[in-house]
């Protein structure tokens, strides 16, 4: 046989059908996590040095997993670009394997009401929604001729098999990838440690920590370095040796250093604390003497990766947890979110949008950056494409739609609505992408209260101080929970052709938020960054 350990896999016995394999993989990973990932989140929630906000966010992430595991609401509203990597160990694979994998993937995105996130070009500047989330990113390698190091599970797979790694990669975490075409000068402990501090500080919170952080130094080419990074964020190298050698290894000391830097950053699990990372992976590769590629990347808290091994007799698919509540520590770890439910009262500021923006802003004057708010009432939901259209109206000398000034604006694009439900999985998108519109909108009375995730730029913060605006951060990574517990209704009111980016009015009840930027321009994340430097 081989060294392949099948104990963590389910086996499906029938002739290999790559469309069905893709269906099974993306159906499983879109709604359930592996036991290892859930245990890491539980550990973070129960860590002695976790802040109250760390505990609360991790608690919500775990409750989100419990809701999603029922199979109706996907784990995240951004159900991601479908990534499939394969390593062939002597298997005879069909010529149309990419077409088969694509067919199965597209079927699940359609049938499971997963979000269609891809934009395809109709010209260099114009785009359209293909309404199937395709194309998928598919790369199949021969074990001995892979661009990046072959994962150990693929190396140990039976002869005549094909190993596959499936991933749903969201835009927020992909956008955190950074690449430096460095030199040997970076390869000292002091210089590399300083580089880690610099790059981890740039991650911020908009990709939904706690993160799996990967760092890769070396590589015979930029593309080898970056593919190794991508696979590292997917957990492909969990069994890689930590013993230095000429080919590839993980560095234990730098992983500990990176984890400590993550703790000390102060960002925590989104709203201040120590749980910025669940795991760090630092990999060293060979390099050309004249260059040293270095890359940094993350996988978000919606860590959706799944392994499969296909043989002539059937296929093995990595197990996930169908009932997270049965895991040891789950009940204790989810207590903070349960205790801070709407029934508990608590110290949160309760606000309702029915009295208008001016009344909301007046109420928010009592809140400090970092304070928690429970928001009820109607909010406007709009993101990149809608903002671009509003800007076109302004540029053409036209007025903004009246709705832009009547409600708080939440940047989000929900997953498609499951049958019998009010809305699909719903969570915030990255705030910073809309910062360019600060002056255009606020000067016209719009975007005076916004909801999103992550840190914002100085121009946005300055605009908040100038116009008395407030930015509220909504927890990321809990989209199934938000759709299931905090949303009462929705309607599309404009730009229906934009699909998931259409403008909506969404009715929320006790939606949890945190004050990030107040009306004086005080910024929560800037305060954290300044504190971490002391």
List where the protein language model places each region.
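Non-transmembrane, aqueous-exposed alpha-helical and coiled segments at domain scale
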Residues: 1-215, 220-345, 424, 442
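Short acidic/polar capping segments at secondary-structure boundaries
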Residues: 144-145, 169-173, 219-220, 455-457, ...
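Short, solvent-exposed amphipathic alpha-helical segments in soluble enzyme
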Residues: 182, 228-232, 295-299, 312-314, ...
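Feature captures the catalytic cores and cofactor-binding loops of soluble hydro-lyases/lyases
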Residues: 236-262, 266, 270, 381-511
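C-terminal binding/interaction regions
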Residues: 273-280, 287-288, 484-534
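Short, structured beta-strand/loop micro-motifs enriched in basic residues and often containing a Trp
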Residues: 347-359
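Short, well-ordered loop/turn sites that connect or cap secondary structure elements
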Residues: 364-367, 373
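Generic structural signal for buried aliphatic residues
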Residues: 373-375, 379
């Amino acid at each position: 046989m081989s060294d392949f350990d099948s104990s963590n896999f389910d086996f499906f016995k029938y002739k290999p059908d790559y469309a069905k394999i893709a269906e099974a993989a993306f159906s499983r990973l879109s709604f359930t996590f592996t036991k290892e990932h859930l245990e890491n989140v539980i550990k973070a929630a129960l860590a002695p040095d976790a802040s109250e906000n760390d505990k609360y966010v991790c608690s919500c992430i775990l409750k989100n997993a419990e809701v999603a595991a029922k199979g109706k609401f996907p784990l995240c509203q951004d159900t991601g670009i479908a990534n499939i990597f394969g390593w062939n160990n002597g298997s005879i694979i069909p010529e149309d394997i990419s077409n088969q994998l694509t067919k199965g993937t597209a079927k699940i995105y359609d049938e499971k009401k997963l979000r269609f996130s891809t934009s395809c070009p109709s010209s260099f500047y114009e785009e359209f929604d293909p309404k199937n989330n395709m194309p998928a990113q598919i790369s199949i390698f021969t074990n001995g001729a892979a661009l990046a190091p072959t994962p150990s599970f693929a190396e140990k797979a039976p002869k005549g098999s094909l190993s596959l790694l499936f991933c749903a990669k969201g835009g927020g975490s992909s956008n955190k990838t950074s690449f430096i075409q460095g030199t040997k000068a970076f390869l000292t402990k002091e210089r590399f440690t300083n580089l880690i501090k610099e790059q981890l500080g740039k991650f911020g919170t908009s990709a939904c920590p706690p993160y799996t952080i990967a760092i890769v130094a070396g590589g015979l080419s930029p593309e080898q370095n970056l593919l190794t990074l991508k696979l590292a964020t997917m957990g492909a190298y969990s069994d890689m040796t930590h013993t230095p050698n000429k080919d590839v290894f993980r560095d234990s000391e730098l992983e500990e250093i990176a984890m400590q830097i993550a703790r000390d950053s102060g960002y925590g699990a989104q709203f201040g604390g120590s749980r910025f990372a669940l795991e760090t992976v630092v990999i060293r590769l060979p390099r050309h003497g004249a260059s040293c590629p270095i890359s940094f990347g993350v996988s978000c808290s919606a860590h959706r990766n799944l392994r499969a091994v296909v043989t002539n007799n059937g296929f093995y698919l990595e197990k996930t947890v169908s009932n997270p509540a049965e895991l040891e520590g789950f009940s204790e770890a989810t207590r903070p979110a349960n205790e801070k439910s709407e029934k508990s009262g608590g110290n949160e500021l309760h606000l309702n949008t029915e009295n208008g923006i001016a009344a909301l802003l007046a109420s928010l004057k009592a809140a400090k950056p970092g304070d928690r708010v429970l928001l009820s009432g109607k909010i406007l939901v709009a993101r990149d494409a809608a903002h671009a259209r509003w800007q076109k109206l302004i540029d053409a000398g036209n007025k903004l739609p009246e709705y832009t000034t009547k409600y708080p604006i939440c940047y989000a694009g929900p997953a498609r609505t499951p049958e019998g439900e009010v809305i699909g999985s719903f969570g915030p998108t990255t705030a910073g992408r809309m910062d360019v519109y600060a002056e255009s909108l606020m000067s016209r009375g719009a975007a005076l209260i916004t909801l999103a995730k992550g840190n914002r730029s100085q121009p946005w913060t300055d605009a908040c101080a100038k116009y008395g605006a407030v930015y509220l951060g909504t927890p990321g990574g809990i989209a199934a929970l938000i759709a299931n517990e905090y949303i009462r209704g929705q309607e599309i009111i404009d730009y229906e052709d934009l699909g998931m980016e259409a403008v909506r009015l969404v009715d929320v009840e006790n939606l949890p938020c945190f004050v990030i930027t107040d009306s004086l321009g005080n910024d929560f994340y800037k305060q954290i960054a300044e504190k971490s430097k002391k």
